[in-house]
Amino acid sequence: MILRRSSVFSAFYLHAFLLCLRTTVSDASGHFELEILSMQNANGELQNGACCDGARNPADRKCTRDECDTYFKVCLKEYQSRVSSAGACSFGTGSTPVLGGNKFSTKGTRSEKSRIVLPFSFAWPRSYTLIVEALDFNNETASESGKLIEKAYHSGMINPNRQWQRLTHNGPVAQFEYQIRVTCLEHYYGFGCNKFCRPRDEFFGHYTCDQNGNKTCLEGWTGPDCNTAICRQGCSTEHGSCKQPGGCKCLYGWQGPYCDKCIPHPGCVHGTCVEPWQCLCDTNWGGQLCDKDLNYCGTHQPCLNGGTCSNTGPDKYQCSCEDGYSGVNCERAEHACLSNPCANGGTCKETSQGYECHCAIGWSGTSCEINVDDCTPNQCKHGGTCQDLVNGFKCACPPHWTGKTCQIDANECEDKPCVNAKSCHNLIGAYFCECLPGWSGQNCDININDCKGQCLNGGTCKDLVNGYRCLCPPGYTGEQCEKDVDECASSPCLNGGRCQDEVNGFQCLCPAGFSGQLCQLDIDYCKPNPCQNGAQCFNLASDYFCKCPDDYEGKNCSHLKDHCRTTSCQVIDSCTVAVASNSTPEGVRYISSNVCGPHGRCRSQAGGQFTCECQEGFRGTYCHENINDCESNPCRNGGTCIDKVNVYQCICADGWEGVHCEINIDDCSLNPCLNKGACQDLVNDFYCECRNGWKGKTCHSRDSQCDEATCNNGGTCHDEGDTFKCRCSPGWEGATCNIAKNSSCLPNPCENGGTCVVNGDSFNCVCKEGWEGSTCTENTNDCNPHPCYNSGTCVDGENWYRCECAPGFAGPDCRININECQSSPCAFGSTCVDEINGYRCLCPPGRIGPDCQEVVGRPCIANGQVTADGAKWEEDCNICQCQNGRIHCTMMWCGPKSCRIGKARGGCPASQSCVPIKEEQCFVKPCPSLGECWPSAPPPPSKCHASFSYQDDSCANITFTFNKENMPQGLSVEHVCNELRHWYLLKNLSTEYAVSISCEPSSSASNEIHISISTEEPRTDRSPIKDITVQIIDLVSKHNGNSTIIKAITGVRVHQIPSPKTDYLVPLLSSIFIVLWIFALASAFLWCIHRRRKQNTHSNTATSATEDNTTNNVREQLNQIKNPIEKHAAHGVPIKDYEGKNSIIAKIRTHNSEVEEEDMDKHLQKARFTKQPAYTLVEREERAPNKNPNWTNKQDNRDLETAQSLNRMEYIV
């Protein structure tokens, strides 16, 4: 889409105006400068024909007194098609001091007196009208208004430029030449000096400004504000970044100048990586760190003297030596002297290691190949250079020395080396010249430079012999240019201006309200009113302030305000947005979205479309095209048409005026012909028909038709009796050479539809909107500042731009979020939520899927809310799930809640109170203000508790040992217990059984906690308590989980139910008793039978003893394993500890079936530990039931006391 450019500026309010009254601001955005180049008043006359001073000579009618005192006055105002002197000089006025007499020229000089500077603080309109008056200063009356010598009118167009444009006025009385230019102040650019751009190189930007005021990023920076650094070329965009140009900072795991190389595993020697921390071995290298050389022969070539190398293993090799060599690397030669290895006359002698050379004099080295350096140490003295020879040396002596070792001094004064000296003195190894004053150097041939910075203020020092002379710059004098000529001595500044003396000049520091070179100008900055769009102008001391309407901003209120750049807007449609406002009761104000630019009005259409109604003078889809009102060529007589908004302006050629340049300026209106000559008007000229013998262009001479001002622009005048004829210089024509032959606009230098306007000997281009530059060659960047919202991409065109929107957005400036819910994609009563480039459906209970198209089970009502089927939530320590209308929760008793002492009920439920925990319940001290929520009546004790002795298939007791240093302070026993209730294995168990966990601190060890786990009666033969104990051991041994409490566990003791022994004695005695009663009569026989049974009993006892010995033999083999911890029971029965290296095999010996015993062994074998030291298995101990247990501390090796019968397995980390 094509849009009109819209700039964004900050808004000002009335309080900003009050602030401006106290703030010093720039007093202009540019200057109009005019400089007088030359003046020629041949006769010293005024415009009315009178002499400047005195009367005429009656004989030759020439002025008799001194010449005119000429100065100039300038009036600059808006462009006038018909120039009038009436009215104010709206753009400014100024004057020069007296510059000279009748004839003078300032060309080639740098005098500021001939220059007038008119500052302006508004957008320069380019077209202007200039009135220049040459006046005669009246020395006698010193009147402020001088007498008019000549007046020049010029209407034209000029663009800001550093180059001067030269203009010439050829009047009937005098001719003068001047030049003009318009320059913008620093940081101001554009045809109107109203584009601000200040270079910066800091956090908010790094750029300079080109000749048109556009930002040009410094090297290494990019982005709209040039604050995005360009990284080093080749820097990986995925693994590197930078904050400074040329940088490349790597992410973790990457390295290299371009961050494209991964960091290998630490210690990786001969390996590479594809991803960080890998070590992929190079060829012929192996090992975890690629440090094992698999091809030592290939990489090191250790075998010498032709030996053959064979790889025998990583970092190992073997050399097979050639005949005549031996050693590990074949480095030892056999019969080495046969090859005559000793060079340079050396004698060879064989040794056990090979050979040995006895070298001739002057040679050394293993084979006598090295020439002995006889120059070490250096034999040459006094800096002589030593040259080594065979068994000798030669010295190259420096100047002043001779001899074999440079030990003899030479007399240098014999050669008369001193030039400007009194005498020469021979020294040892040198000579000395006694120089004359002003000379230096070893030979007194250097003139001493006496210029040591004595000349001040830029003076040039000229060196003399034994002296100097200062050449002072203008403005300074004195022997060392130390005196500044005070140009302020004459007090040139007016209206209270303060004079500041400068080098060869001065500067007036004007008070508020005055300006000009001498502070002679009093300017009202609100005349003409620079504020646009109905804004009120306030004139300040040295500036003006525009109070803009709500919808405009900028220095002159010339730009539509984009409210949505600084505040959030609600998009109503493509034409309207709503912004917050205090001016309406609703708190919002509806404004235009500026889609149609500053020259159109947006009309919203159905379906999110819109149309633009253009202002007069504009057309196009977005009113971006200014209608060319110059298409009909309305300007006549060589006038140039300048297209404006719904109007045009004609810039007339010299000699023409009027709206369409249809009026020939009457050059005879000022009666230029003297002595009753008749004036005839020409185009930009006049002709005088002289009478009574008068001659010259204005009938002012008796002698000749020609004078210096007759022919213009360098033309040569020829007197032909009753008339004159001008021979014009190249490029000019006309009776007086005042018409240019070739226009500076031919051929048209302005490109891209620009209009060329002749201005003296130069031209100016009026560019079409969207183009800039001196010849309209540069396309204006309509994408600056970025006009596209929501990450849209701006495409710049010729006075237009197009926004290519990101997915999910639309509209001419990508401000409209596409509503994907308009098509109602969500079905079955669901709610559609619009998102960026998508939508989301909020499904009702019973439905799921992207569009709620899938049916699910019935919902549940939990805590007064409808919950979808399959949803899960937590209730205290339990997890609940809705399954087709029914709620299923885990059955874990959550224990008492924690609370804070001192608060109202401490956060406990209404039926409970916060009870402080006991000292022994604080596991990791201190526990300040900790409490637990309990009801007023304590619950009945459970038969399965950590402090009770009851155990069965639904109750288990476990003791955990902790490392408190790894646990946080303020941890109570109940905190630990609550953490255990959240273990996943107990969670899984609580889905099938009701589970209760209680904890009590150990009375014998401060780092132990006794824990009881109870479930409801098992529904099968297999007890869940056995499974859960095995899983707890496996969980703790592998340190699974992220819990701090699990990681702090260092030991586990699991207490199990003893297996009852099978007793055959009771049924045997019962049978015997019955038999005795039946066979009472046979007492003798029964006595015999009784005797025989006693013998059988002895036999069984011997057999049992044999079996016990066999068992003891097995245990004796196990006891051969060294055990670092040994414990003894109270009755002296030893308990053996067995230590496994990587696993634990806990064999619980019972009298149950072998299958069940093997199954239990397999479960216990899961408790494997990957770190040393390993756990220690303590064999179980059986004790009598129904007795309170006395716990044994595994850390102090104390004896076990008598306790209830139980099976105990102890694991020590």
Swiss-Prot record:
Transmembrane segments: 1065-1087
Membrane topology: Single-pass type I membrane protein
S-S pairs: 184-193, 197-209, 217-226, 231-242, 235-248, 250-259, 262-273, 268-279, 281-290, 297-309, 303-319, 321-330, 337-348, 342-357, 359-368, 375-386, 380-395, 397-406, 413-424, 418-433, 435-444, 451-461, 455-470, 472-481, 488-499, 493-508, 510-519, 526-537, 531-546, 548-557, 596-612, 614-623, 630-641, 635-650, 652-661, 668-679, 673-688, 690-699, 706-717, 711-726, 728-737, 745-756, 750-765, 767-776, 783-794, 788-803, 805-814, 821-832, 826-841, 843-852
Ranges facing Cytoplasmic side: 1088-1213
UniProt domain EGF-like: residue ranges: 227-260, 261-291, 293-331, 333-369, 371-407, 409-445, 447-482, 484-520, 522-558, 592-624, 626-662, 664-700, 702-738, 746-777, 779-815, 817-853, 918-956
Domain of life: Eukaryota
Annotated glycosylation sites: 139, 214, 556, 742, 957, 988, 1042
Role noted for this protein: Ligand for Notch receptors and involved in the mediation of Notch signaling. Seems to be involved in cell-fate decisions.
Protein name: Protein jagged-1b
Organism the protein comes from: Danio rerio (Zebrafish)
Phylogenetic lineage: Eukaryota, Metazoa, Chordata, Craniata, Vertebrata
Gene that this polypeptide is encoded by: jag1b
